[in-house]
Amino acid sequence: MSQHKNRVGLLVSAVGVVFGDIGTSPLYALKETFSGHHPIPVNPENIFGVLSLVFWTVMLLVTVKYVIVIMRADNHGEGGSLALLALVTELTRGRRVHYPLMMLGVIAAALFYGDSMITPAISVLSAVEGLEVVTPDLRPYVVPITAVVLTALFAIQSRGTGLVGRLFGPVMCLWFITLAVLGIVNVINAPGVLKAISPTYAFEFVFRHPLMSFYALGSVVLAVTGGEALYTDMGHFGRFPIRLAWFCLVLPALLLNYFGQGALLIHDPSAIQNPFFRMGPEWMVVPLVALATFAAVIASQAVISGAYSVARQAIQLGLLPRMTIVHTSGEEAGQIYVPFTNWTLYLAVMALVVGFQSSSNLAAAYGIAVTSTMMIDTILVSFVMALLWRWNMALVITVVGTLLAVDIAFFSANIIKVAQGGWFPLFIGFISFTVLTTWRRGRALVRKQLKKQAVPLDVVLRALGPNVSRARGTAVFLTAATDGVPPALLHNLKHNQTVHQRVVLTTVTTAETPYVPDSERVHMTDIGDGFHRLIIRYGFMQTPDVPAALVLCKQFGHEFNMMSTSFFLSRETFVPSLNPGMALWRERLFSFMTLNATRATTFFKIPTDRVVELGTQLEI
């Protein structure tokens, strides 16, 4: 009985977190198709054609591509572009495609941030715009109300969303039931609309009106925004609950609502100004606006939490500098808060709300990031099909070719909207890509320089004679290199002429898996003369904790008393090089990021009163 309750609870939670983004798409998808920047005439022929396109887009891009195919490509249970990237880079290591695929994954992560800025803005704006259906006099209040709602949402992030999060599942279940009921009520008035399930209507629409259907694709894709979240959030809930929730509740509710909106438009074409809020009786508009706003906030929360998760993954995979990561729950390790990410998102979202003013204006910006990410996911998963699943090459080409053709069609329909707002996700993607690749390149140059300057450990051990005093206690030297002597140790020897009785050269590494169990966390070897090499491994979904890892060294017969242990860290500063490894502006950007990165002491949870920092100058 308790196991059944747990499954139901997991199912409800999955509905609350995973499907918020795609669940709010009915607020604007059909409206934008018929009244957006390239409006389509509202007549039965076009309504049937668009509904057929929506139906098969949802079935192909979400049900087949993500739910059936890509969700099989988990990285030890985790999903998402960076998890998929880590899996693919491991599979292609040593092959020519390794670097291009890595760059594709980085582009997907960069585009995600553009998407995560647009989602809260368009979701809450489209929900609050329902007030205009009550009376047009409320139109001037839409943007201020949206700003207040979003400000409150971002302000509570530091306190955690555990308590409020318990309401997410039930509220979203109510939302999807409401979508279904509204859809059924309207379909009953025009049941013939269900004939649009046949793909012939989509094909006829495309062949009869090629240009119009091309423009329509740019808005139809809004029906699948958030589809990638099914894969991204797989690590939190598992494959089965997400698939069950999709097939049993979310998919039927979405399709019923879209067909209900289509039935309404056939019966009353003037409802196109806001078909969703016109689906029910007048008395229902205000409660529906309230429920839609709650659903939009939940969709925004899911994206914000996803942005924190991607930031942590990027830090662990060496794509971003160290940032402060706050755990907001003692029970859920996945509930984190990244202050820098939070307030950067907030400022961008506010700029979008104030700058674009309406969901219609924002819709043009939305599609490019989504279609680009979906296209990259298709390319990455093709290598999983071929190298991990060992599918027949003909099957891989057929499946990937079909999915990629659909992705390219939608991407092409959205790229023409650059001037109307599509420039924004491309601009954010470019900035994010520049930051990610500059940090990755800079750290690679630093590692190269450190390796070049490194003194072999055996040379230092031989040089340790009777004249070098041994201080009592333990010295832990943190170093990125797994061989040689850390610069901090050389500086300590040079200036203090002393070495501790026990010296532990410690390297924290990130595995290409999301989690590393405690049993595999540490590996310690005795080098001799009181020196030890310690390797601490974490997954890219975990936050490093060096003192906690030292406790695990008991299995090697070593115990660490924090009061007699000193931690030595190198503080790197960079000087101009005659042969720079990067352009000057990238060197300056890298230096700026290094200067503003969270201190290693804080990031690795090392007691500040036990830390000694020694400066090191490097040319990059």
From Swiss-Prot:
It is a multi-pass membrane protein. It catalyses: K(+)(in) + H(+)(in) = K(+)(out) + H(+)(out). The keyword Cell membrane applies. One of its GO terms (molecular function) is potassium ion transmembrane transporter activity. The chain crosses the membrane at residues 10-30, 50-70, 102-122, 136-156, 168-188, 211-231, 246-266, 284-304, 336-356, 368-388, 393-413, 415-435. InterPro entries: K+_transporter, K_trans_C, K_trans_N, Kup. One of its GO terms (cellular component) is plasma membrane. It holds the Pfam family K_trans. It is found in: Cell inner membrane. HAMAP family: Kup. Transport of potassium into the cell. Likely operates as a K(+):H(+) symporter. Belongs to the HAK/KUP transporter (TC 2.A.72) family. This is Probable potassium transport system protein Kup 2. It comes from Rhodopseudomonas palustris (strain BisB5). The gene is kup2.
